[in-house]
Amino acid sequence: MLEATGRVVMVSGASRGIGRAVVECLIAGGYHVSAAVRDPRGLVGSDRLMLHRYDAESLPSAEAWVAATIERFGRLDGLINAAGINPEADLTDPDETALDAMMLINVKAPMRLIRLALPHLAKSGEGRVVNVASMSGKRVRNPNAGYAMSKFALLALTHAVRQYGWEHGIRATAICPSFVATDMTAHVTKWPREKMSDPRDIAELIATVLRLPNTATIAELLVNCRLEDML
């Protein structure tokens, strides 16, 4: 297993939910973390935690975040794409606003960050990319076609990174959770909140993936809080 000490990881979506749990877990584990937030107010940085304002809709914002991370820490060993949105984009809805937003935030933004991070991850020799996808990226079980499409696309992106980065020591993993007890699932009524996965447990799994050596890599990790009847 790789040692965390001295390794630098960027985490998007760090203001809340899984992203914030990942930041807390990695800091506790000894990593240096560059955390992307929409609004850094209310959060406190430290010698190992850098907070950076990031707008997932903006390419210049992504460029600025990666550049600031390298300027601060001098290296980059991992990228966790945890930012995401899930508005309704029904198959029959003629309004494509929500669909466009999800494809931008859930797919294009991670791709931009990965593209910008690749040279630095390759320099590490043990670079890691973890994309927080969803069980909705493995099967479709509700009318929100747009969300499922975005997560299927994120899985495809993960495998593209594996193909491109393999000879450079870059390993990519898609984490595919079902219901996680965050504000993104606050509207869910068909499954009890107390039976949903804890974001801290998802964070621990991500931390484990980061520590795996180049010779033991996971392409996709499915995490569920209930029994699957189909995949």
Locate the predicted segments by residue:
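Conserved NAD(P)H cofactor-binding loop of Rossmann-fold oxidoreductase domains
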Residues: 82-87
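Active-site-adjacent segment of SDR/Rossmann-fold oxidoreductases
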Residues: 139, 160-170
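Conserved glycine-rich cofactor-binding loop
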Residues: 15-16
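Residue(s) in the substrate-gating loop at a strand-loop-helix junction
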Residues: 134
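C-terminal helical subdomain
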Residues: 167-170, 174-175, 191-231
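Substrate-binding pocket helix/loop in short-chain dehydrogenase/reductase
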Residues: 90-91, 95-100
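Active-site helix of classical SDR
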Residues: 114, 150
